[in-house]
Amino acid sequence: MLSSITVRTKSGRLIPLVLAATLLAACSGRISTTPPAPVQSEATASADYYLQQMQQSSDDSKADWQLLAIRALLREGKLPQADDLLGQLPSQLTEAQQLEQRLVSAELEIARHAPQQAQAILSKLDISLLSQAQQLRYYQAVIAAVQGKTTLAQIRAYIALQPLLTQENQRKSNIDATWTALNTLTPADLNSMVINANEDILRGWLDLLRLYQDNRQDPALLKAAIKEWQTRYPNNPAATMLPSALDNILHLQSDSTASIALLLPLNGQAKVFSDAIEAGFNAAKNGAFNQNSAAVTTDGTPTAQVDAPAQPDVNAAGAVSTSTQSADATASVLPADSAALPPLDAAGDPIAPSVSPGNPDAHIQVYDTSSQPLPELLSQAQQAGVSLVIGPLLKNNVDQLNTISTPLNILALNQPEQVQNHPNICYFALSPEDEARDAARHIWAQGKRTPLLLIPRNPLGDRVAKAFATEWQSLGGGSVLRQTFGSSAELRSTINSGTGIRLTGQPVSITPAQPTSVTIAGLTIPAPVQPPVASGGGVDAVYIIATPAEITLIKPMIDLANGTHNGISLYASSRSYQAGAGPDFRLEMEGVQFSDIPLLAGSDPAILQQAPAQYRNDYSLMRLYAMGADAWTLANHFAQLRQIPGFQVQGATGTLSASDNCVIQRKLPWLQYQKGSIVPVL
């Protein structure tokens, strides 16, 4: 046995000689070595640092540093370099390195906007083998790989991600993101979901969504329902940290409407429009639109039709654009042999009015936008104690709102070309463009995918085409075709030639929307601008913007050139609606669907008959009268529109809701000519 040799240190302690020699050798001959690479941890350093460590490391740890460098390159937005380095990984990797290789490969595919490839990679990963940091990245990747329609897998990923987040702001953001994703699910999505018995958190989220959708029209009922839900699901993260949108609703304070300012042009060409809006506003304020009268008269028939003289479209001059009618057009409600149309929900069931009438004692002040600059009028209104402004009406005035700073809540009666999100401004437009956007949504919902716009060869047609195509592409549609026509004389000439109208248009050119970004593993990457998807196959839907006289010529020519059983659905705007037309016209229009505001579609003939005669006898002014009534309703629910996603009111101009930028969207009733009658499209 070797003898134990010891050395006495200066402190008097004894240590083995071999150990002392080792310590001395370590101190005198220290060699600089690369620290171990934490391949399963967070990669917080720069790509240059990891690349340097990779160059200095041995073969055993080189791949670890290489994987960390790839992640850093992704975070820095250097996708080509990350891709090159990923391709240089050795073929022989440890199990831990292989897991990281697959995870970072999925992250790269997401950054390159290849979600399907990313999903294929992620589906092969065993989550149980991942570290906590890797699991966090995995669920972030699953969420980011669902670009577009929300899926159940994405909702589950949000739920699994929540306990992995360590900072309160991260947990709050994830709860808000979960809630946002849930609110994009359709009734069909919810009905088709299969929930496992152990998914109590998911079940709680879905119950919260249901009670929100059932009670969002009444904050008091919603508050009580949420309190009961928190008792039933105490372990759900939202039970102690509500989504911001829900929390805002529970603390919603309705804005005062004790004093309202109307900003309207009281002189010039637009005065007639202002008068109609003000009349409808005052009628609604005084309760004329709160009678909930039946959609038919006592003998079961709608009210009689009235003549509708033409009105000029002064949108080019900046005023609100209204649908025009030719002098021989008539319109108000459905003909006597048709069913009236009450407001319907998505299932086709009647909807009862869901909002309170507002404050009838509100003080109304009217300001003339044609006599003073808009900033001065807003300043005067503020000094007068006004709490809410309705208007301006003219488009050039509405455009100025982006450059004016005011604390007043504003319901503008038009919409600028480029809408900016202001927390105190909503936009309510009654225009052919607005109607075209609703038509795009309706046609899309009917399963059509290759529409053609048949529009007049003038600025009105251009504006409608742009609005329709923009909305269509926002829904996920491809390019939209447009085909123009000239005067009635030109249309008659085409009839005489016997050629008809062949549906062969040119793509509508629009400026693509700003691309969204993708955030993955801490990196926010702008999405590339994608060109519109080309529409495949033939035209399956035609949206027609024409007067009654024009559509009388157009419809037969479409049938002549394409046949009456061609599978192409025809849609028309309210511009072509001629309620007073006889059975011959209605038979000629067989199958055509068209939209109109509820008040003129027969939802409440009693209210229509109570309107002043000068508006009942003018189709376009009656629309503005209804717009004024809805302006009163919207003003009294301004806070809800701004803060409650999905909040709706049943108005005289449609079912009204607000987009993210508080642009009021109108869902219009759709009607159809069927065997000489007009029936609702359900």
UniProtKB/Swiss-Prot annotation:
GO molecular function, one term: enzyme regulator activity
The entry's keywords: Cell outer membrane, Cell shape, Lipoprotein, Membrane, Palmitate, Peptidoglycan synthesis, Signal
Classification via InterPro entries: LpoA (IPR007443), Peripla_BP_I (IPR028082), TPR-like_helical_dom_sf (IPR011990)
Membrane topology: Lipid-anchor
Keyword Nucleotide-binding included in the entry's annotation: no
Gene3D superfamilies tied to this protein: 1.25.40.650, 3.40.50.2300, Tetratricopeptide repeat domain
Recorded GO CC terms: periplasmic side of cell outer membrane
GO biological process: peptidoglycan biosynthetic process; regulation of cell shape
Cysteines paired by S-S bonds: none
Lipidation (N-palmitoyl cysteine): C27
Localization terms from the record: Cell outer membrane
UniProt signal peptide: 1-26
Keyword Methyltransferase: no
Pfam families: LppC
Lipidation positions, renumbered (S-diacylglycerol cysteine): C27
The family this protein is said to belong to: Belongs to the LpoA family.
Record note on quaternary structure: Interacts with PBP1a.
General function of this protein: Regulator of peptidoglycan synthesis that is essential for the function of penicillin-binding protein 1A (PBP1a).
Annotated protein name in UniProt: Penicillin-binding protein activator LpoA
Species, as recorded: Edwardsiella ictaluri (strain 93-146)
